[in-house]
A protein has these predicted regions:
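Serine-hydrolase catalytic machinery in alpha/beta-hydrolase-like enzymes
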Residues: 1-33
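Short, well-ordered alpha-helices that flank and scaffold nucleotide-derived cofactor binding pockets
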Residues: 32, 56, 122, 151
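A short, hydrophobic beta-strand element of the alpha/beta-hydrolase
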Residues: 65-67
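Gly/Ala-rich beta-loop-alpha elbow adjacent to hydrolase catalytic centers
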Residues: 42-47, 51
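Catalytic active-site module of serine/aspartate enzymes centered on a nucleophile-bearing elbow/loop
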Residues: 145-156
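The feature captures the conserved acid-bearing segment of alpha/beta-hydrolase catalytic domains
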Residues: 71-145
Length: 156
């Protein structure tokens, strides 16, 4: 529970349920319809954090597109240091103004994303991960940045 995200204690408690749905229902349906295609998981903000977390919990995803992921959340860095990704490629993206937020917890995203990238470089190498800095803040060009994350993984 992190009250910087929400005062609702249920926020974040259903990530395992979501991953189980993806593993047991969504991906089998996709494979039955389109064949054994590789899967990339991605998300924005808390969704980006979910994508990083999910890649540590299962080997289902070949790639991750984590755009403005909430890596500043309490205990994330400890988790990331102790749980390696199973993905073959990871795209990280952050707006260059995000680490200058007034909220000190959210401003920690700069050092936290740099640490996340360092960990991924150790795990995957520079060829298999990238940290792309974009102009603007957290809410600038979300769709374009997400698209670039998926394209990077597909082109990888």
């Amino acid at each position: 529970f992190d009250d910087a995200v929400s005062r609702d204690e249920d926020v974040g408690k259903h990530a395992s349920d979501t991953l189980r749905y993806i593993e047991n229902t969504l991906v089998p349906w996709l494979h039955s319809r389109y064949g054994d295609v590789p899967c990339v998981v991605g998300g924005y903000s808390l969704g980006g954090l979910f994508a990083l977390w999910a890649s540590c919990k299962t080997d289902l995803f070949v790639g991750v597109a984590a755009v403005s992921p909430s890596v500043w959340i309490k205990n994330w860095t400890v988790f990331a240091e102790n749980n390696h990704t199973h993905a073959k490629s990871v795209y990280l993206s952050l707006g260059d103004r995000e680490e200058h937020a007034r909220n000190q917890r959210m401003a920690a995203v700069g050092p936290c994303i740099r640490r996340q990238h360092e960990l991924l470089l150790q795990q995957l190498s520079a060829e298999h991960t990238v940290l792309e800095w974009n102009k603007g803040g957290h809410f600038d060009d979300e769709a374009g940045r997400m698209a670039r994350g998926f394209v990077w993984n597909v082109d990888y």
